[in-house]
Amino acid sequence: MSFPRRPKVTKSDIVDQISLNIRNNNLKLEKKYIRLVIDAFFEELKSNLCSNNVIEFRSFGTFEVRKRKGRLNARNPQTGEYVKVLDHHVAYFRPGKDLKERVWGIKG
């Protein structure tokens, strides 16, 4: 079963959309500054996750680091060989109520 390809939105697309939104509100901010803010935002997000902080954006969601247990029965898909996976940490996102409700209504 194959799924149809979904459109991909890049950081440049987001910068363009934010720039348009700002202009529609009669404000002026160059795209290079919008890009700097986005880059700084993601650096802060990564820095806080690496410090094991929980990052909460009300109604949007929560980012946190969770520990994933290791296992012995993992399989290398290229060789078929069984490998041991050690305990490790992963970034986790838990969507907020508003985001869940909005995504729930997506068609397709």
Curated annotation (Swiss-Prot):
It comes from the Bacteria. It holds the Pfam family Bac_DNA_binding. GO terms for molecular function: DNA binding; structural constituent of chromatin. SUPFAM superfamilies: IHF-like DNA-binding proteins. One of its GO terms (cellular component) is cytosol. GO terms for biological process: chromosome condensation. CDD domains: IHF_B (cd13836). The keyword DNA-binding applies. InterPro entries: Hist_DNA-bd, Histone-like_DNA-bd_CS, IHF-like_DNA-bd_dom_sf. Keywords: DNA condensation, DNA-binding. Histone-like DNA-binding protein which is capable of wrapping DNA to stabilize it, and thus to prevent its denaturation under extreme environmental conditions. Belongs to the bacterial histone-like protein family. This is DNA-binding protein HBbu.
